[in-house]
């Protein structure tokens, strides 16, 4: 048994003893995805965290994801293996700035992407993910003004899909916003038989070049069900691990080399083991914030 096998065995034993569930986002390292009980997108992970009977949730993702699990499951122990695993886009929306913008607009409906902090969710009316953003926007009365926080690209996509005019917060995902049309066009020249599949956090001019726009779970389902054998994947590179496992024989190409989320890659097997041992770093949310943030999440999950 080599060191990695010993580490996995130790994680499995600690998971059993702690009555824990390990949740992983698609953008995690391959070896972390492989030891998880569930791998999914933000919406799937939120639903799993809310429904689990496990006593401990080890969240292999970034801080806002673990925070969301703590909001939905306040009596569970939620641990994030590395506290440095933050989300730059979530940090682009600060609660005081949001309050000021709400006052400026005069009672807008605030739709916050789950890629936000708990206090921003608490100031919001409803949350959304990339998988359900269109459904969320369509659920809002057409006579209400909508402020979309924080991803300008996802908001622009939702506006185009629904025909609604949204006030967009000027945030973005560094990985997706760095994908440019020339990257897609170059990849198409190199792989002319490949379909282009991109995430709605990409720029509008990149989305215009895509054959399919979908959330991470939607991307996985699309490539699995497609009769095509080659795909250019416009999202963080970690997703290609699950695609490769589910679709042996199909080929996946990244349009540029910079499609890596450094925060997601901070989580390692050693840190997962240590988190299970110590039940730290634990993620908690003050009750007065948790209660209000929960309302926004529950409105989303009810759709």
UniProtKB/Swiss-Prot annotation:
Pfam families (alphabetical): NadA (PF02445)
Any one cellular-component term (Gene Ontology): cytoplasm
Entry note: cofactor: Binds 1 [4Fe-4S] cluster per subunit.
HAMAP family: NadA_type2 (MF_00568)
Record-given protein name: Quinolinate synthase
Molecular function terms, GO-annotated: 4 iron, 4 sulfur cluster binding; metal ion binding; quinolinate synthetase A activity
Cellular localization per UniProt: Cytoplasm
Domain of life: Bacteria
Residue sites binding [4Fe-4S] cluster per the record: 87, 173, 261
Top-tier EC class: transferase
Family affiliation: Belongs to the quinolinate synthase family. Type 2 subfamily.
Binding site for iminosuccinate: 25, 42, 113-115, 130, 199-201, 216
Function field: Catalyzes the condensation of iminoaspartate with dihydroxyacetone phosphate to form quinolinate.
Cited NCBIfam families: nadA, PRK09375.1-2
Species for this entry: Desulforudis audaxviator (strain MP104C)
Pathway: Cofactor biosynthesis; NAD(+) biosynthesis; quinolinate from iminoaspartate: step 1/1
Alphabetized UniProt keyword annotations: 4Fe-4S, Cytoplasm, Iron, Iron-sulfur, Metal-binding, Pyridine nucleotide biosynthesis, Transferase
Listed EC numbers: 2.5.1.72
Matching InterPro entries: NadA, NadA_sf, Quinolinate_synth_type2
Catalytic activity as recorded in UniProt: iminosuccinate + dihydroxyacetone phosphate = quinolinate + phosphate + 2 H2O + H(+)
């Amino acid at each position: 048994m080599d060191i990695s096998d010993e580490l996995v065995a130790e994680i499995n034993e600690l998971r059993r003893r702690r009555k824990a569930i390990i949740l992983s986002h698609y953008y995690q390292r391959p070896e972390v995805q492989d030891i998880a009980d569930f791998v999914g997108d933000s919406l799937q992970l939120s639903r799993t965290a809310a429904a689990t009977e496990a006593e401990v949730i080890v969240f292999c993702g970034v801080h806002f994801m673990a925070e969301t699990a703590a909001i939905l499951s306040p009596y569970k122990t939620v641990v994030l293996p590395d506290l440095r695993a933050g989300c730059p886009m979530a940090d682009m929306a600060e609660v005081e700035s949001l309050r000021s913008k709400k006052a400026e607009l005069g009672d807008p409906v605030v739709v916050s992407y789950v890629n936000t902090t708990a206090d921003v969710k608490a100031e919001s009316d409803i949350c959304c993910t990339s998988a359900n953003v269109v459904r969320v926007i369509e659920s809002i009365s057409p006579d209400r003004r909508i402020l979309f926080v924080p991803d300008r690209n996802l908001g622009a996509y939702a506006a185009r899909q629904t025909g609604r005019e949204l006030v967009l917060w000027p945030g973005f995902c560094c990985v997706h916003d760095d994908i440019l049309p020339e990257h897609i066009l170059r990849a198409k020249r190199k792989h002319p038989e490949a379909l282009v599949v991109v995430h709605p956090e990409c720029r509008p001019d990149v989305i215009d070049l895509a054959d399919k726009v979908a959330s991470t779970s939607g991307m996985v389902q699309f490539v699995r069900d497609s009769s095509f054998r080659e795909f250019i994947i416009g999202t963080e590179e970690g997703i290609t691990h699950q695609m490769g496992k589910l679709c042996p024989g199909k080929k996946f190409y990244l349009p540029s080399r910079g499609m890596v989320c450094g925060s997601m890659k901070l989580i390692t097997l050693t840190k997962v083991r240590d988190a299970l041992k110590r039940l730290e770093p634990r993620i908690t949310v003050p009750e007065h914030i948790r209660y209000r943030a929960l309302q926004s999440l529950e409105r989303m999950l009810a759709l």
